[in-house]
Amino acid sequence: DPLREEAKASVEALRAAGISKIVMMTGDSERTAAAIARRVGVDEYYSEVLPEDKANFIEKEKAAGRRVIMVGDGINDSPALSAANVGIAISDGAEIAREIADITVGADDLQELVVLKEISNALMKRIRRNYRFIITFNAGLIACGVAGILQPTTSALLHNTSTLAISLKS
């Protein structure tokens, strides 16, 4: 496959968005893989890799406690897409890769991976913030109930109202 124009910028942006280790695995020759890896700035690369080698690499990374995202577009990527914590297929890729992947990126542009990571980060931030609020608010309601400041019906009403408000805000 030819090198995508946006590959280097996408790798840099993914690293800036919090991806700590970026690995390229390809069936291409060592010489070709090394040249591409240097140009795009990945942390590690593996050449002349078979489909089962990709899946085995992912299993080893997961066994080491890492969360693994696999991006692929071909039939040969299917076992690895399935093995990863999150498999991402490129829309112009093989149909089986799109079926196996957890997410299919609609545009044939690696920058979409950066957008996906930014959306993911924003959603997780919102979930954590909402969780902290609900726990703190409910602990306050329990404390007020135990202290006799709030009646049980008032506490239940406030609890349900806060849950509804957080749900609507989300």
Regions found by a protein language model. Name each.
Residues 1-76, 80-86, 118-121:
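Cytosolic catalytic headpiece
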Residues 18-19, 40, 76-77, 82-86, ...:
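Membrane-embedded alpha-helical bundles of multi-pass transporters
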